[in-house]
Protein backbone atom coordinates (compact mmCIF):
# COMPACT_ATOMS: atom_id res chain seq x y z
CA UNK A 1 0.00 0.00 0.00
CA UNK A 2 1.09 3.54 -0.46
CA UNK A 3 -0.35 6.93 0.39
CA UNK A 4 -1.53 9.26 -2.30
CA UNK A 5 0.61 12.30 -1.69
CA UNK A 6 -0.56 15.66 -2.91
CA UNK A 7 1.93 18.02 -4.52
CA UNK A 8 4.92 18.46 -2.26
CA UNK A 9 3.97 15.64 0.14
CA UNK A 10 6.05 12.52 0.58
CA UNK A 11 4.57 9.21 -0.58
CA UNK A 12 4.78 6.51 2.09
CA UNK A 13 4.72 2.83 1.15
CA UNK A 14 4.39 -0.21 3.42
CA UNK A 15 3.79 -3.94 2.93
CA UNK A 16 0.99 -5.48 5.01
CA UNK A 17 0.07 -9.10 5.63
CA UNK A 18 -3.59 -10.01 5.87
CA UNK A 19 -5.64 -9.52 7.88
CA UNK A 20 -4.57 -5.90 8.20
CA UNK A 21 -4.68 -4.38 11.66
CA UNK A 22 -6.42 -1.03 11.08
CA UNK A 23 -4.58 0.74 13.93
CA UNK A 24 -1.21 -0.43 12.59
CA UNK A 25 -2.23 0.56 9.05
CA UNK A 26 -3.14 4.09 10.15
CA UNK A 27 0.03 4.40 12.23
CA UNK A 28 2.41 3.18 9.47
CA UNK A 29 0.87 5.14 6.58
CA UNK A 30 -0.40 8.14 8.50
CA UNK A 31 -3.82 8.07 6.81
CA UNK A 32 -7.20 6.82 7.94
CA UNK A 33 -8.40 3.42 6.73
CA UNK A 34 -11.66 5.02 5.59
CA UNK A 35 -10.02 8.05 3.96
CA UNK A 36 -9.30 6.69 0.50
CA UNK A 37 -5.95 8.51 0.64
CA UNK A 38 -4.08 5.30 -0.14
CA UNK A 39 -3.90 2.75 -2.92
CA UNK A 40 -2.82 -0.83 -3.39
CA UNK A 41 0.29 -0.96 -5.55
CA UNK A 42 1.33 -4.61 -5.17
CA UNK A 43 -0.40 -7.76 -4.03
CA UNK A 44 0.38 -11.44 -3.67
CA UNK A 45 -2.99 -13.03 -2.99
CA UNK A 46 -4.85 -16.12 -4.17
CA UNK A 47 -7.83 -13.83 -4.73
CA UNK A 48 -5.82 -11.04 -6.40
CA UNK A 49 -8.40 -10.79 -9.19
CA UNK A 50 -10.88 -9.45 -6.60
CA UNK A 51 -8.54 -6.69 -5.37
CA UNK A 52 -8.04 -3.41 -7.18
CA UNK A 53 -6.04 -0.27 -6.54
CA UNK A 54 -8.89 1.33 -4.60
CA UNK A 55 -10.06 -1.70 -2.58
CA UNK A 56 -10.43 -0.61 1.04
CA UNK A 57 -8.64 -2.16 4.01
CA UNK A 58 -12.02 -3.37 5.28
CA UNK A 59 -12.85 -5.04 1.95
CA UNK A 60 -9.40 -6.68 1.91
CA UNK A 61 -9.94 -8.07 5.39
CA UNK A 62 -13.40 -9.33 4.43
CA UNK A 63 -12.05 -11.07 1.31
CA UNK A 64 -9.25 -12.60 3.37
CA UNK A 65 -11.77 -13.87 5.95
CA UNK A 66 -13.94 -15.45 3.23
CA UNK A 67 -10.93 -17.12 1.60
CA UNK A 68 -9.68 -18.53 4.92
CA UNK A 69 -13.12 -20.03 5.58
CA UNK A 70 -12.83 -22.20 2.46
CA UNK A 71 -11.61 -25.76 2.97
CA UNK A 72 -7.99 -26.46 2.05
CA UNK A 73 -9.24 -28.41 -1.00
CA UNK A 74 -11.21 -25.37 -2.16
CA UNK A 75 -8.26 -23.05 -1.55
CA UNK A 76 -6.03 -25.38 -3.56
CA UNK A 77 -8.49 -25.41 -6.47
CA UNK A 78 -9.64 -21.79 -6.08
CA UNK A 79 -8.81 -20.80 -9.68
CA UNK A 80 -10.69 -23.84 -11.05
CA UNK A 81 -13.70 -23.12 -8.85
CA UNK A 82 -13.83 -19.55 -10.19
CA UNK A 83 -14.65 -21.01 -13.61
CA UNK A 84 -18.00 -21.99 -12.07
CA UNK A 85 -18.54 -19.30 -9.43
CA UNK A 86 -18.75 -15.60 -10.23
CA UNK A 87 -16.38 -14.51 -7.46
CA UNK A 88 -14.99 -15.33 -4.03
CA UNK A 89 -18.16 -14.20 -2.27
CA UNK A 90 -20.35 -16.55 -4.35
CA UNK A 91 -17.99 -19.45 -3.59
CA UNK A 92 -17.92 -18.51 0.11
CA UNK A 93 -21.74 -18.52 0.27
CA UNK A 94 -21.90 -22.03 -1.25
CA UNK A 95 -18.87 -23.48 0.56
CA UNK A 96 -20.93 -25.61 2.98
CA UNK A 97 -23.03 -27.30 0.28
CA UNK A 98 -20.13 -28.20 -2.02
CA UNK A 99 -19.11 -31.83 -1.58
CA UNK A 100 -15.44 -32.55 -2.15
CA UNK A 101 -14.19 -35.93 -3.32
CA UNK A 102 -10.43 -35.32 -2.93
CA UNK A 103 -9.24 -38.83 -3.82
CA UNK A 104 -11.47 -39.25 -6.88
CA UNK A 105 -10.03 -39.01 -10.38
CA UNK A 106 -13.20 -39.96 -12.30
CA UNK A 107 -16.96 -40.02 -11.93
CA UNK A 108 -16.73 -43.80 -11.42
CA UNK A 109 -14.59 -43.09 -8.33
CA UNK A 110 -17.29 -40.66 -7.13
CA UNK A 111 -19.97 -43.31 -7.72
CA UNK A 112 -17.95 -45.81 -5.64
CA UNK A 113 -17.42 -43.31 -2.83
CA UNK A 114 -21.10 -42.32 -2.76
CA UNK A 115 -22.07 -45.98 -2.55
CA UNK A 116 -19.59 -46.69 0.25
CA UNK A 117 -21.01 -43.77 2.25
CA UNK A 118 -24.65 -44.78 1.69
CA UNK A 119 -26.02 -46.49 4.85
CA UNK A 120 -28.23 -48.82 2.77
CA UNK A 121 -25.21 -50.32 0.99
CA UNK A 122 -22.62 -50.21 3.79
CA UNK A 123 -23.44 -53.69 5.05
CA UNK A 124 -22.69 -55.24 1.63
CA UNK A 125 -19.22 -56.61 1.03
CA UNK A 126 -17.03 -55.00 -1.62
CA UNK A 127 -17.26 -58.18 -3.72
CA UNK A 128 -21.05 -58.02 -3.56
CA UNK A 129 -21.05 -54.33 -4.49
CA UNK A 130 -18.70 -54.97 -7.42
CA UNK A 131 -20.77 -57.88 -8.70
CA UNK A 132 -24.25 -56.36 -8.43
CA UNK A 133 -23.71 -52.66 -8.89
CA UNK A 134 -23.05 -50.91 -12.22
CA UNK A 135 -20.70 -48.10 -11.23
CA UNK A 136 -20.37 -46.82 -14.81
CA UNK A 137 -24.13 -46.42 -15.18
CA UNK A 138 -24.38 -44.72 -11.78
CA UNK A 139 -21.49 -42.40 -12.72
CA UNK A 140 -23.31 -41.47 -15.95
CA UNK A 141 -26.51 -40.85 -13.98
CA UNK A 142 -24.65 -38.60 -11.52
CA UNK A 143 -23.05 -36.63 -14.33
CA UNK A 144 -26.35 -36.18 -16.18
CA UNK A 145 -28.33 -35.15 -13.10
CA UNK A 146 -25.72 -33.29 -11.09
CA UNK A 147 -23.15 -30.55 -11.42
CA UNK A 148 -19.53 -31.60 -10.99
CA UNK A 149 -16.16 -29.95 -11.46
CA UNK A 150 -13.28 -32.32 -12.16
CA UNK A 151 -9.90 -30.91 -11.14
CA UNK A 152 -6.36 -32.15 -10.86
CA UNK A 153 -6.75 -32.80 -7.12
CA UNK A 154 -10.27 -34.22 -6.95
CA UNK A 155 -13.87 -33.72 -7.92
CA UNK A 156 -16.30 -31.15 -6.52
CA UNK A 157 -20.06 -31.72 -6.45
CA UNK A 158 -21.61 -28.28 -6.84
CA UNK A 159 -25.06 -26.95 -5.98
CA UNK A 160 -27.52 -26.65 -8.86
Enumerate the language-model features and the residues they cover:
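N-terminal ordered "arm"
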Residues: 1-35
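Acidic, proline/glycine-rich low-complexity IDRs
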Residues: 112-160
Amino acid sequence: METRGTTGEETISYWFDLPIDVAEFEEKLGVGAESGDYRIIEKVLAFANEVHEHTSVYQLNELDFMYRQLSSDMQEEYVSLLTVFENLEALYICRNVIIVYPDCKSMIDVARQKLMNDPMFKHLSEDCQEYYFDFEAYASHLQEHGKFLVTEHGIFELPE
